């Protein structure tokens, strides 16, 4: 039963709300002179009042009779009011911010609730990491609704993570007040091949009558997609083509249109609505992964709504996609997602619908943001020691740690991972490389860099070796512990010396992201919380990330959010070719393949 994210549950205040609506008791707050965006009927209702009591909406209409001596009256002065915005799929860890700092960053932009999938920290710290993020969020006004990570590891047997989550763990977490469903079921092969583990975690969620969120990245809309949805998966954010999003909506699956820092899918997938003229009730706008400099520069869901409008989606439709549609997806529309009697009093004031400029934000009947700034305090949370000490590398990393051997060869053909800028997929390419002193050489002239993934959770000493293409770097190295989803230590570069320096720099600072050239650190973002997040403020983090972005450009890479693209190199649930600490993975066949192509 949903009652964790309200000031008071409806059954405790139903008499009061009914009395306030009838003028028998005064409201706590009344908003007057607003232009109500009614997401239930997709219309603007002029000159509308809203009466609020006990953190909930008591009346929508003429509320003069609800105003008492101590009622707080807010004059909207003709501004639009809309339900508070909900992000249906977000990994807070990708912001590199703590949950409390993330809340401070997004609430002034109209975001009142997030459906957080903390599978990044869970891969490092297990369910303890999930608990830490829940505790961090409790001191904020933001409604932090959590989905239990479903795929830890993302694809069992192909990588080493800090923890594992099974059906029995999911069953236990479904009892937690903050858990509203299951995080993205990335192991779609497990669903389609009917593995006990995949169907077990889905089944435990369905038994609890909670929402199973999805991740179906295959460009297939027939029997596979049908089988995936039939298992109980309710939504998916992995559509990159309009036809994929349309097919999912037609099958009753909520298609989540993604617009984050690195993945700009909205331009294409919005055509599912604009070109096909279909009902948009099964469409939701989400961010998935957003970096600090993006939050600081562009905002959050307000920016994504604006982008949707720019792509031809009607403003009221776009607002439905971050309010009632999202609430219905998570079976919470009886509590969230609309400005209607009985619902949580989560309301945003919008100056105009073209620029989606947010002027005020109310959560649970309290004014929490005004003029782009938070007006309420947020409690600081200190992460425990195990979260701050997550770098467990067995062997000392030296330049020799990056040797890729091919004895008695002068040249060899290697499988190379080619990235696709601003997309999550990769291509498998075959490239001939030189061998010197039995060591395979990368080739920056062909845009081919060396890549190594070191296990960092259990001191196993394992490492996977490969090559990547598409970054455009001529000299230098990059390293990151943000390396989805196992978050081992990933290093790419043109020479072993810079690669060793990059790796050891992150080991010393507890994890993060770094760019190195000619023995010099050009940009560093320390992420001491599980090697994923920092307790620094947004502005400071944005500055460090911007400096790192500049460092990438300095060494020759000009793609958008290159560190996010780099972070997906080890993610073995996405096509086509990936590298984990155990080796090179063909993600179409889900099998390990040799680094070298057999002649």
From Swiss-Prot:
Tell me which UniProt keywords the record has, alphabetically: Hydrolase, Manganese
Which reactions fall under this protein's catalytic activity?
Answer: adenine + H2O + H(+) = hypoxanthine + NH4(+)
- List the InterPro entries hit by this protein, alphabetically: Adenine_deam, Adenine_deam_C, Amidohydro-rel, Metal-dep_hydrolase_composite, Metal_Hydrolase
Member of which family? Belongs to the metallo-dependent hydrolases superfamily. Adenine deaminase family.
The cysteines joined by S-S bonds are none
UniProt keyword annotation of Protease present: no
Q: Which Pfam families match?
A: Adenine_deam_C (PF13382), Amidohydro_1 (PF01979)
Q: Which cofactor(s) does the record list? A: Mn(2+)
What is the name of this protein?
Adenine deaminase
Enzyme Commission numbers on file? 3.5.4.2
